[in-house]
């Protein structure tokens, strides 16, 4: 007869212990379920949305880039552009110059004068072409032809009146319905079929309260909203690529029929999108192809007597990339948050088990003496935290794929214009929200339990578990009995209070961020006028118009300024610094002795000085981003009335240092609107609205969730306090019994332990606040909240941090000769930030 295997009797203790202390384990489980569930939901939502976005590239025929011309291109030009080859610009200019010369001068009648004029023209064209050839690398030996497919994607910028009150609430960009490129995902209703029907962006509609069936006015013309859509090339509603923040409240994109498009009256923007014939493998190849295609496009456009108004490759388009980049960073943040909270809970479990082992020392000694091995006891005591964590991870993942996923998706849909998605299985979420928490819990508790189990059976039986024995009791102050009792409780539970401190400190920092963000946005909006130099800041495409004349204004408030962007490089961070050229005795940037600056002397902003600990007399070294050039500036003074990281020079100094024409400038500062400069000459206008709309959008997208996050932090703090207070009481069961025997009432006993914990908690809270302030200041100095909040730049894996609108290359298409746009460009084809680029 086969001998029946005897089950390990220790297994029976596990469910009994769970039921016996179910409140504690339930609180821990809920803590883990909420944390794991939310992070799991974040991973699942992220992956599902990113998969939908990646599939949308093909499904909705996303562009590889777009450009805009001043006039509609004919079939010949489009066919030439699609070849990806360069036109012979020099020969084109020679032919055109010869034609104009022939019209003005008869070669046969005045052969000598004709030859002399022609030689001079050739010389000028050679010199000018040589400069532009070097600047734009038109004869780059590594140039490769980039064949593309070009599609028309015209639009009109109209005014939107969504409540039909007769006043425009914002702008709406209207596209005609097409089936070729940059398609839209229909989220509600239907696509327009009639001339008076329109489909608008879903997120904008949610923000302003427009629903399917409502009517809106587009530049005074009524349209019926028949659908809510999400354009694949407008995941975020950036009206301009240089906008500091997308604006889904005062900017909208829409689709109408071709008849509806033709019925509108605003200027048509001749925008063309392209897709590469050979699909790039990654962003590195995208950038290489874009650079080559840009050179070919420039030459073809110039030779067709057209002007290039805008150029934007996909990899640098914030409207396409901002949302997906942000979702990727959320995953990393969620993973770190989960790991930290799991470690805190693991230490709570470790302290609990350590106390349990001390309490059950006699039982453990008996079991060890009866033949149970250390391994069996280690496995028994570690089973509880692992089982609770595993169950919590399973439940949390179930909730993550259902409830919390929808919460995170709702957050994204509240911020971005995203297409429909399908929930996808995410193995990364399972690994990071199930395997890693269990491993962390196992590792922390294993270390503690193995350390405790090193004692001999006799030491367990004698309750002799302390390695160091105090020869005599700690001498306490001559206070009352109850006060000394409370003090001894504090000393006996230092480990528990230390864990409580770490938990409260970490949660306190999160709570400070949750409370601080809305307050900071509110402060920023209410004080933005004090942070701006002027009410209006006009950045021009060039300081000269098409005829070569300097752009001027009759506005008496207007004041010229120069601006460029350099880098402050360090081992840890390359940070952009704005360098301004300001007029002497400026009414807007009031530096009294600016005109007295000589050579490389400069003023720097107080923010710059504070962040990098600079003072008068120090030397600042700044680098060009795309060129191997360095500039040294000697700090001559600190300018206190600027929140930007900036260097201030006189305009004369600026032009000399950056080798510019003496009359060159970037734009105008003005307290009143400038109305006598052609809109086509203006690259961007920065007003208070442009600054505050970013705050409005952030507040709208995240404000309500910050409130939820505050409640979550308070709940986590309450859970930690409950668990550790319960541990302290359990650890002192014998002492509590003795005080009861001595006649103390429950109220008095509670005051001993609860008051002790309360006192420690108050001290912990104060210390946590102080340390939190120190840490937040350190983070502040590194990131400067107001800087990342309003930068123009968008990160694209280090390939291109500034949005490249290429205004200097665009200006190359104005007139017969290439016009050098020194005032606005850094010569690399990358647009400069406006004067408030880093307020």
Regions found by a protein language model. Give the residues of each.
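Interfacial "coupling" helices/loops that link adjacent transmembrane helices in transporter permeases
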Residues: 13, 21, 347-387, 719-759
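Selective transmembrane-helix segments that form parts of the transport pathway or gating/packing helices
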Residues: 381-398, 434, 438, 469-476, ...
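C-terminal transmembrane helical bundles of large multi-pass transporters
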Residues: 666-669, 678-781, 785, 789-792, ...
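Juxtamembrane segments of multi-pass membrane proteins
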Residues: 67, 481-611, 615-618, 622-624
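Membrane transport/envelope proteins' first extracytoplasmic loop
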Residues: 2-346, 355, 409, 414, ...
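C-terminal membrane-exit region of the final transmembrane helix in multipass inner-membrane proteins
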Residues: 352, 399-400, 429-467, 801-838
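Short helix-loop junctions at transmembrane helix boundaries
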Residues: 396-432, 763-828
């Amino acid at each position: 007869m086969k001998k029946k295997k005897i089950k390990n009797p220790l297994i029976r203790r596990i469910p009994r212990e769970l039921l016996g202390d179910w409140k504690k384990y339930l609180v821990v489980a809920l803590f883990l379920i909420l944390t794991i569930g939310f992070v799991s939901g974040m991973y699942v939502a992220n992956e599902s949305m990113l998969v939908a976005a990646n599939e949308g590239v093909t499904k909705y025929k996303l562009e590889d880039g777009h450009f805009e011309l001043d006039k509609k291109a004919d079939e010949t030009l489009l066919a030439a552009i699609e070849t990806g080859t360069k036109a012979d610009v020099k020969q084109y200019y020679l032919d055109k110059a010869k034609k104009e010369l022939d019209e003005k001068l008869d070669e046969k009648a005045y052969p000598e004068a004709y030859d002399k004029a022609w030689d001079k023209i050739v010389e000028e064209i050679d010199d000018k072409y040589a400069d532009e050839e070097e600047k734009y690398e038109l004869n780059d030996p590594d140039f490769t032809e980039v064949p593309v497919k070009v599609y028309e994607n015209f639009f009109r910028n109209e005014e939107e009146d969504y409540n039909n009150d007769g006043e425009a609430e914002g702008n709406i960009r209207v596209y005609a319905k097409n089936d070729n490129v940059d398609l839209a995902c229909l989220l509600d209703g239907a696509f327009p079929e009639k001339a008076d029907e329109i489909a608008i962006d879903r997120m904008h509609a949610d923000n302003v309260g427009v629903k399917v069936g409502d009517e809106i006015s587009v530049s005074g013309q009524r349209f019926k909203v028949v659908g809510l859509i999400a354009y694949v090339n407008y995941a975020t509603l950036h009206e301009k690529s240089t906008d500091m923040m997308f604006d889904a409240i005062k900017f909208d994109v829409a689709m109408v029929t071709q008849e509806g498009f033709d019925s509108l009256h605003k200027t048509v923007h001749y925008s063309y999108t392209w897709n590469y014939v050979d699909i790039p493998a990654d962003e590195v190849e995208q950038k290489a192809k874009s650079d080559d295609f840009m050179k070919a496009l420039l030459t073809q456009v110039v030779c067709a007597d057209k002007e290039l108004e805008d150029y934007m490759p996909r990899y640098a388009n914030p409207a396409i990339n901002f949302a997906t980049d942000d979702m990727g960073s959320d995953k990393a943040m969620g993973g770190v948050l989960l790991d930290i909270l799991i470690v805190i809970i693991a230490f709570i479990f470790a302290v609990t088990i350590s106390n349990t082992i001390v309490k059950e020392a006699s039982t453990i000694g008996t079991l060890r003496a009866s033949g149970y091995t250390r391994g069996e006891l280690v496995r028994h005591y570690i089973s509880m935290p692992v089982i609770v964590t595993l169950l919590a991870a399973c439940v949390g993942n179930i909730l993550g794929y259902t409830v919390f996923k929808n919460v995170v998706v709702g957050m994204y849909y509240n911020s971005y214009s995203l297409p429909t998605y399908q929930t996808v299985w995410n193995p990364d979420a399972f690994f990071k929200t199930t395997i890693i928490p269990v491993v962390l819990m196992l590792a922390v508790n294993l270390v503690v339990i193995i350390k405790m189990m090193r004692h001999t059976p006799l030491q367990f039986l004698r309750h002799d578990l302390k390695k160091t024995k105090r020869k005599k009791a700690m001498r306490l102050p001559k206070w009352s009995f109850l006060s000394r009792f409370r003090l001894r409780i504090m000393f006996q539970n230092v480990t528990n209070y230390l864990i409580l401190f770490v938990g409260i400190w970490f949660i306190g920092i999160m709570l400070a961020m949750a409370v601080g963000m809305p307050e900071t946005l509110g402060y920023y909006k209410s004080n933005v006028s004090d942070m701006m130099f002027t009410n209006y800041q006009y950045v021009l495409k060039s300081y000269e118009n098409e005829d070569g004349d300097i752009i001027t204004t009759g506005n008496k408030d207007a004041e010229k300024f120069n601006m460029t962007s350099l880098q402050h490089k360090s081992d840890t961070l390359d940070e952009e610094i704005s360098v301004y050229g300001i007029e002497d005795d400026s009414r807007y940037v009031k530096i009294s002795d600016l005109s007295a600056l000589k050579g490389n002397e400069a003023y720097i902003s107080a923010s710059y000085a504070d962040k990098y600990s600079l003072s008068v007399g120090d030397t600042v070294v700044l680098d060009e981003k795309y060129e191997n050039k360095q500039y040294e500036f000697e700090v001559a003074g600190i300018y206190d009335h600027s929140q930007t990281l900036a260097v201030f020079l006189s305009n004369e100094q600026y032009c000399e240092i950056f080798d510019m024409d003496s009359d060159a400038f970037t734009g105008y500062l003005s307290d009143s609107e400038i109305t006598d400069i052609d809109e086509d000459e203006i690259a961007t206008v920065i007003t208070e609205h442009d600054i505050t709309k970013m705050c409005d959008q952030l507040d709208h997208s995240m404000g309500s969730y910050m409130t939820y996050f505050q409640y979550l932090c308070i709940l986590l703090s309450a859970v930690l306090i409950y668990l550790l207070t319960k541990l302290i009481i359990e650890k002192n069961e014998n002492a509590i019994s003795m005080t009861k025997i001595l006649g103390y009432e429950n109220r008095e006993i509670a005051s001993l332990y609860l008051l002790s914990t309360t006192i420690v908690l108050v001290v912990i809270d104060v210390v946590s606040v102080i340390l939190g302030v120190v840490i937040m200041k350190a983070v502040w100095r590194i990131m400067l909240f107001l800087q990342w909040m309003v930068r123009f730049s968008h990160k694209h894996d280090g390939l291109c941090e500034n949005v490249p609108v290429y205004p200097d290359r665009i200006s190359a298409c104005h007139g017969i000769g290439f016009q050098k746009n020194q005032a606005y460009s850094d010569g690399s084809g990358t647009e400069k930030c406006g004067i408030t680029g880093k307020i």
